[in-house]
């Protein structure tokens, strides 16, 4: 059976999946539009038995709902995004430090660049991420602007790409910003105590 695409319904379903993942796997989860979810599982995957059991468990839970999923872990958001969409296996773990080898043969479209830039790069003869990353940066930046270099740097871990996590509507949280980093244990204890009191009053 074929049904018409419904972008609004798809976006709503993706939002629900993101909130589900927030409660199951990691406190740092966001929509990776248009068809994915990104999570920072560092420090959390051991709660699922490790990286492979966690990935396998996620894939199995989707399969139980008659949904197909591709799940990847990599050093960077960009690399995980690309591998999950290009590699046909259900689960992919890119070993630490192996990002270049994992993505260099993948198509340019997985760099999350605007379609116009991808089309122009194809016209110039570029097909893969590796071909593009091997070229001098300056001429490409002059022609295509900074976005191309930014996406390459994010994929290879040369530029940070923070995840702006989703928050549940009923989430209660408190925070304190500091002008300078603090490291003294007694100072941390003092402010944690204050934050706990603030949190209790919000409950």
What are these model-predicted stretches?
Residues 1-203:
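Gly/Gly-Pro- and Ser/Thr-rich, intrinsically disordered tail segments characteristic of DNA damage-repair
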